[in-house]
């Protein structure tokens, strides 16, 4: 019989219950309410999937912060600064994720970076030749037993040993973490044995790194690892799960040869591997087909998915085929049930996590009982696709004409950077090592209440404007008092750097409860790009104009770039992403023009998501980077030479895209570097990056206030790599999620660190 499965399920709860519980724990320190909430969310997830008839329900996919952090704890790979070897309690767990600063310790958090090309973030493991492993965290075993006690037989999920080591960071130059495989495997073998003893029959081992382009040496280490794992608990059936794309030929060959019972392949983003997989699958293996998109919110084309499933069953037999989501459903919102205000027609085109469970059930029934058993569902699905295809709301002829008429040679600024830099320095007269922030400032409950009051109609526009202007003035005066050189208005009016703009652009729609986990307690509510994009009126001009009127210091106009808006939205799937991005770029260009006309001399267009859009296969990079950089330049090319264009990027490795970053031709780029101790700057040095750079000198994802000496040390590291006249001083990222006291304290220390270095170099 053909079974259904999911690889993982949303963790935060339908109403962000996990976020509330985490923030309460971080404030009050009481463990019991947090653990009770976590248990409740796990149980609800298992029961919901069981009710929908999912055959293989995952366990250990839930986490309090991050599943890679859980694996760090499981294997005892705790860095020395967090009391490695001691019991891993909640305080240690969260210190690794967020840093810790109290009367007994002051430790920086571990690095965090993007999970492949998604907007989820994982904690980066740290490995050295001295790293040792031990089974230090039995969560995978405990949660299997917890589900079993509820009458739910689950398939435990582990981050695979190969991907765990590949995703880590070597703390010693030249060291390959894969060399630790021999030390790591006994921990996995122990876990598998204990899961078998607890009654597990299948275990899902995620190896998403197999989707990357790997060398023969890496693949050999993967094969050797699974030879050991398969022998550890012979009664267990291992399912190696890959996702986010097609496996390269050598990786697919390796996966098919692994001594495991099943292979999961993504058939949404990796449809090209379907035929090869069917022909190469050994007779002793099961093929899990990822037919339902786990990363986007559009309904599945049931006819196309069923055709793939039917052919697989015909070729392999029903007992050797499983129907699944392409990847974990943590990347989509929980359920459409709570979306009471979403347009009914648009809503009919969508499927969130719970609806995707229903799609899996329908597909499985169609395979098991034949097409006629789901003829009604197939007809309804086909009608929805036809209605969406022909809906006038998704097509805007004026937008399409404007994109069609773009001059491919007119996306550059008037003069080269060296000339612009001289013109801008004369205009602004900034000191060496100018200080600024990335854009957002802390948002209090009063700010959030003000936005809610306007939405509910409790406040009129005049009341709302008065409140926001007071917040902006407070932020401007604080920055002046601290001594920052370039100011921002603080963005109190913005819920999110993408949602805010989407609400003001045509072609976007919004959910009420469409929250998706970004990391830990951080959730985002991605807009839905359903149609052609245009800007009906200015979006930010009045707030920025007001902020600049309050001070003689330059204030940056703050925009989100077209690539980031694209990457952090649920994007229409009926046209190339590059086409949608060009539409957004033209809308942002109109805003740049209006900001400049309103007197803003500095405009920041943030592109933190530029790198995460890279295809996982390098052979596809050039095409993506060409249109992504073109879209950024298209959005800023109307700016005059005396207008300084800033951009910001975070969570990025820049070595392999440094040419593209230079091709953006932003006057100033600020980047997140504090957790990496300025190592990310090496790419800019090696490339001789010509423009100004603001390396982040403190980690805003942690509540700790860094000491002045700590930031000064980082600035000195930057000054060893770059000419001081091209260095800006700023935090790693925006400050929205921090509190006002810690923000002010950290910025005071940052400004003093910059002044101290200025004095030291005689600037």
Swiss-Prot record:
Its EC number is 2.1.1.14. L-homocysteine binds at residues 438-440, 491, 606. It catalyses: 5-methyltetrahydropteroyltri-L-glutamate + L-homocysteine = tetrahydropteroyltri-L-glutamate + L-methionine. InterPro entries: Cbl-indep_Met_Synth_N, Cobalamin-indep_Met_synthase, Met_Synth_C/arc, UROD/MetE-like_sf. L-methionine binds at residues 438-440, 491, 606. CDD domains: CIMS_C_terminal_like, CIMS_N_terminal_like. The keyword Oxidoreductase does not apply. Binds 1 zinc ion per subunit. HAMAP family: Meth_synth. Catalyzes the transfer of a methyl group from 5-methyltetrahydrofolate to homocysteine resulting in methionine formation. This is 5-methyltetrahydropteroyltriglutamate--homocysteine methyltransferase.
